Amino acid sequence: MSGHSKWHSIRRTKGVLDQRRGQLFTKLARDITIATREGGSGDPEANFRLRLAVDKARAANMPMDNIQRAIDRGLGRGGSDAAALEEIYYEGYAPGGVALLIEAATDNRNRTASDVRATMTKNGGSPGEPGSVSWMFETRGLITIDLSVKRLDPDEVMLIAIDAGAEDVQIEDDIVEVYTDFKQLAAVRQQLIAAGLPVTGAEKTMIAKTTVQPDTADALKAMRLIEKLEDLDDVQKVYSNLEITSELAEQFVSG
């Protein structure tokens, strides 16, 4: 499985998410600010992208004061300048020919570009030109269902998701990932909630059209590079076309 939950599980097993909660809150706040500005509203009920960002922040136990400050920044309140915050993408390759699409939120393009470039070159990667790998990915909606919250038959959950309009459903342990056409994300999410499923997250994601499986040594190097990129303050997410098998995940965590 090459899905979001596999990588998220690896990061949690290594203790990264808990150790760097302050950095996580900063990244979540940027998501909220950009969602507020782009959606033109500070009301999550009227701004679906903002609702998703706020839900994600709440799931991470981000304080409501922090959430409201991020919304205020997006609305230009309090003297803050949300216009300086840009959502941009960088592209390149990791060892083994693994394609990387790096999503960043920054108020200083030069700083972020320099940090991304340096991290890639120091860890066996190669920065690419705009468009060099983005064509390998497609925009999708991703809805996460946690069966540890409410015990349900995974096969039944899969059927409900497909009936609701899911394009693909992947199951990893207690986590069910439901992939949708991005334009249908809100509608599918609402149907799953109405069906009583424990929806714990919904977001935009980028899915590789095809995945690659380099040799183990290069795959581990690619995963280390992805981890280092995600640790950069300005980087929000890193998408790749690396197929992460259970065996590879175990080696990465133990290494």
UniProtKB/Swiss-Prot annotation:
Q: Which residues form a coiled coil?
A: none
GO biological process entries: regulation of DNA-templated transcription
What molecular function terms (GO) are annotated for this protein?
DNA binding
Q: Taxonomically, which superkingdom?
A: Bacteria
Q: Name one GO cellular component term.
A: cytosol
Q: What Pfam families does the database record attribute to this sequence?
A: TACO1_YebC_N (PF20772), Transcrip_reg (PF01709)
Where, subcellularly, is it found? Cytoplasm
What's in the keyword line of the UniProt record?
A: Cytoplasm, DNA-binding, Transcription, Transcription regulation
Q: Which family does it belong to?
A: Belongs to the TACO1 family.
Classification via HAMAP family:
Transcrip_reg_TACO1 (MF_00693)
UniProt name for this protein: Probable transcriptional regulatory protein Rcas_0718
| Organism name | Roseiflexus castenholzii (strain DSM 13941 / HLO8)
The record lists the lineage as: Bacteria, Bacillati, Chloroflexota, Chloroflexia, Chloroflexales
